[in-house]
Amino acid sequence: MDLPIGTVLGDNYEIIRPIGIGGMGSIYEAAHVTTRKRVAIKMMSKELAAHPEALARFRREVKVTTELAHPNIIEVVDFGASPTGEPYLVMEYLDGEDLEARLERDGRVPLPIAVQIIKQVASALSVAHAEGVVHRDLKPGNVFLLRTDDGSIFVKVVDFGISKVLRAATTKLTMARAVVGTPEFMSPEQAAGRVDQIDHRSDQWALAVLSWHMLSGRLPFWKPDVNGILNQVIAEDPTPLAPEFAGLIPREVDKVLRRVFSKKREDRFPTINAFARAFEAAAATAAPARAAAPGPAPRPSGRQPGRKGLWTVLFAIALIGAAAGWMYRVEITSASWWPDDFPRADRAQPAGEAKVAPDDSEHRRRRPPRR
């Protein structure tokens, strides 16, 4: 639904302006009617709210994001439903841009800034992994960049809508041979539909793709069709970056990425923070004068997608081959779309400190910039 300016949702949030339209619905800037604190409201479209799978994704995003406490993960402050039944999610307001917009504008990200981004994304996801949650859709559009007072980058990881909770019992949300995510950023186990093999190392693969994309301005796996991308992810290796970007990307970075791009999960780093530390150490071997030098990305052979060319797909692979198509396999009663035992944010008691990976102390002490 389109919300007119001035509409008040849940007696608490006054709509200020529309921000944009996403895959799940519309996003608005709003303000709390009492405190006037700015928030962002993500409202699901009426059409998608009628589909059980889409509704389940939205519900999962609410539950997972609210339970994960980390300064580099977007904060959910409330949720509810409109008078006509569309669910909405109230989040902290982020003033900045996503990494996808940054890459579209600048082509590439200088190595030192890429290191900042990788460390913070890894820090955020390490907390999710410690709680048994795998993001499964890490990509530039889900990495938001805030500028701090000292000019550094502060990262927020967003959209846990298709995350996988490893400790949960198997449900109809996760079917055997199901492929979920964005093809260009999928790990081989995701691309092959091996759902039982998807774990924290799958997110590590996606972060390596993100790293490659930032450094080169292009994707390591790209074909003009979905099946072509998936087959490439499963069977092919990307070309090393160092020879093409001599002086900008050291060979040690290639070595780190090559390890993460192993088709075997056990050959990757044991944790996503271990990958980030190895990447930072490898980046430190770059020549200081040229490591931060920006420049246009070389144009790859063949067309690669821009902002509108990256798509997220949710499709099932048939036993005899790949077949794309939306899955709506979850039965949910629409009377109450959030769990009965899951309190609303305005009634919740302060949560205890989240369990975090032991090597995450540096970024847990960091806090986002004042806005």
Show where each model-derived region lies.
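Conserved N-lobe loop of protein kinases adjacent to the ATP-binding glycine-rich P-loop
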Residues: A31-R38
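AlphaC helix of the eukaryotic protein kinase fold
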Residues: S45-E67
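Activation segment of protein kinases
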Residues: A49-E53, L146-D196, P224
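Hydrophobic/aromatic scaffold residues of ePK-like serine/threonine protein kinase catalytic domains
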Residues: E67, I117-I118
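Activation-segment/catalytic-loop signature of the eukaryotic protein kinase fold
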Residues: F79
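Conserved short submotifs of the Hanks-type protein kinase catalytic core
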Residues: T84-D98, R102
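C-terminal lobe helix-coil module of Hanks-type protein kinase domains
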Residues: K119, L125-S126, T182-P288
